[in-house]
Amino acid sequence: AANSIINHNKNKIDKLVWTSNTDGSKIKVQRCSTDADEGREVASTIFEIKMHEQRLNNEFAVLYRTNAQSRAIEDALRKRDISYRVYGGLSFYQRKEIKDLLAYLRLIVNPSDEESLKRIINYPARGIGQSTLDKLIIGAKKNDISLFDTIKNSSKLNLSLNRGVLSKLLDFSNFILSLQIENQKSNAFEIADLVTKKTGLVLELKKDGTPEGVSKVENVEELLNGIHDFVEGQKEISDSEINAILKKM
């Protein structure tokens, strides 16, 4: 089957692909309208074979060409409660660029999420370094308030920070607060799209012109596609929309 497909490539390098296995069943080609449909088709096929033939998960393999393609497949497998392992790379939601965008969304719905806050307070770079963060953490503990509240009130607290840094902290807290307000009237896709544009997250990734850099941009775009698909499936805008998406991921 592989050889017959390769033969259609006019620019191919001559090679013969072979296996010592016996002949298997013919390849089935299934056309899907969207990546979500493709993911559902893959997961449904695996689920049906598992049920009818009592197969184990490790008897199946899914091959895809680009990292971004794994998002729809992973989502569909999770919905079917089919456990999986990604070889030769990371799971879609374990990739740094995906974690960064999701951290912004988590912080919007929960300002007390300190891990997310620490992750993105200086990404993309906004001049808030580790020494500043250390002082903020100490200040939060000393005043028995959250890290975000410490940032929000940093100009009123004795944190030994210069005016330049205090100004950057105020800009950051105001930015997150504005997103929280926007979240009350916009859907999750609009918020996620706004975050990527306002932070310059995609522009930062585009600075890396390598194939890996291009792949990271595609991953972020695919995450936005996934959020858009989720929103389209909802009947009305809800302020818990982002929470629902984060739970799904």
List the predicted regions and their residue ranges.
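Conserved short loop/turn motifs at secondary-structure junctions
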Residues: 60-65, 90, 122-123, 209-212
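A generic fold-level signal
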Residues: 22-24, 55-57, 96, 196, ...
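Short, flexible active-site loop motifs that bind/organize anionic cofactors or intermediates
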Residues: 28-32, 88, 123
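Conserved helicase C-terminal RecA-like lobe
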Residues: 70-82, 95, 102-249
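Conserved RecA-like helicase motor-core motifs
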Residues: 81-91
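Residue-level recognition of hydrophobic positions within alpha-helical transmembrane segments
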Residues: 34, 93-96
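Helicase P-loop NTPase motor core
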Residues: 1-83, 106-110, 166
